[in-house]
Amino acid sequence: MTTKDEIVHRLRRLDCCAVSDALDKLGLSGVATGVPQAPGSKRIAGRVITMKLAPGEPPPGPPRHLGTTAVEFGDPDSVIVIEQTSGVDAGCWGGILSLAAKVKGIAGVVADGPVRDIDESREMGFPVFTQKLTSRTARSRIVEKAVNEPVTVFGITTNAGDYVIADSSAVIFISAANIAKVVETAEMIVGKEALMAKAVLAGTPVHEVMASNYEFMLKG
């Protein structure tokens, strides 16, 4: 996937475990665990576009189907992040939106709320991360309250323009203010782990490798 954002390019070369270790080293939070990938999804990373959905009346202005504004804002450096924590069993994302997002090149979706048409998303190879699935439509149940305003997903508040990485281990949010030092630290950790792996392959006993490196990796 082509990206114009160098930070996104570097973030996509990492995984959530390395980024989580970097957050630990820097004393930062932002890790959400237990958020499954839809079957067939892959690791994603990018800049955050937010959506907030809830029951009630939509904001003033011409009516638009939920999700369409976020998709139109998106590009290959983007991940759409959705807050739909109302408790209403209604889809905050669906198959046509996944298709439109895939056509735009958007990296994927992270949703704190029920997602529908998950089989369609899987079949087209569009990554979706969510804890909840449903068949129920949003129509007459929830509306889009805001786009690119702060949202809270899985207990973590994130803003448009922040960064997110998601894989089988976790979903991690990093503020725009901290992204450069987090990526740099994660790259350093990956480099140290590569040297450890090289030592194991060369025959160094694993207890020696782990004792001399692993326990002190986040301190040095």
Where are these regions (language model features)?
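Feature captures the catalytic cores and cofactor-binding loops of soluble hydro-lyases/lyases
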Residues: 1-160, 174-206, 211-220
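C-terminal binding/interaction regions
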Residues: 164
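Channel- or pocket-lining gating/hinge segments that regulate access to a cavity or pore
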Residues: 170-172
